[in-house]
Amino acid sequence: MYDGVNVDYTINMTTASWMSASEASRLLGVTRATLYAYVSRGFVRSQAASGSTRERMYSREDVERLRQRTEERRAPDKAAARALHWGMPILESSIALIDGSRLYYRGLDAAALARSRSLEEVAALIWTGRFEALRAPAPVGRVAQPAPDIPFAARAQSLLAVVAAHDPLAFDLRSASLAVTGLRILRLMTRAAIGADPGDRTADAALARAWRVGTRGADVVRAALVLCADHELNVSAFTARCVASSGSHPYAVVIAGLAALEGPKHGGASIRAESMLASMRHARPLRQAVSARLRRGEPIDGFGHPLYREGDPRARLLLDLLGERYGTSAEFRFVREFVRAAADVTGEHPNVDFGLAAAARVLKLPAGSPFTLFAIGRTVGWIGHAIEQYATGQLIRPRARYVGVAPGA
């Protein structure tokens, strides 16, 4: 249940998600006594088997994760390979912590920040470690606005490239200068979205004004931006750190981050979720429509996340806010019904991609706005990762294991 919204639904505990004690013990290569010890220490979840008062079932996800960790300790080379796919941490960062069911920015709950702080305030926290007013950048000279008929990512990338070419301080990588450049980039991203200079307005205020969503909608827009500010070492953050490690300026970091974010396996998933909601708007009954979509080989976009067992807290807050402010609207009722149907069929919770698409649907935002919100918010994290990477002075240069034809073969 999403507090205050009554978006309650039942998650199916399918047999595919749970296993018997004998199967779990076999996969882990341990005795049942050791398995029970893992349960008591919180490493493996268990629940009573259906129709039995004594037999218990064990979480397949937990068992697989525990087995992977054991194998990684025994074979470090395999651990290095797996680190590139939801594996063990490979870089240190003090920006974001994903802890089970919560997301933190520098030790502060991101959901709480999303209800009370602007994106610029969170940017100051992430970039400097403190809530302090960032020094305003010098005005950008006359720069032509990119054509409005190209996608937002392309508009932002072209605008950043042109401004970078004329910014004499683009390569000033001192910490104090980076925060100023970061704020300039954040304003340029907002400008690319609304087609005009936001001036001194915060990103959420500028977007809310351009999109005409009123006070209720402005709160949702602000929260969406803050919730997207960072999410640890995802593909775009890693891309940003790699680019920064070469010594490239922050404009290049964000241009590269946008390229990574746009992919359908990353931030582009929000666009897919937006399209899915549009196509399902009048489908009834929704549960059967969701099942039919799966039968056609089409995914239920915006559901499930490997790092959150009990659901993505970013989506939870966005749905809560929508329910608090638009609970009686037809679009929110549709979103709520869709969440119930999709969760019942798939056993998955909505993630941030769905949350952004739901916000766009309920607020009647322009097409593509879920990705726009994601990208502007995540700009803060990319710059934060760049600042951390610049400070290390290290070039990120992993090695590849050659598996091709042997020389002379």
Per-segment meaning from a language model:
Residues 14-23, 27-409:
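Hydrophobic alpha-helical bundle cores within soluble ligand-binding/oligomerization subdomains
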Residues 1-15:
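Short, intrinsically disordered or compositionally biased N-terminal tails of bacterial proteins
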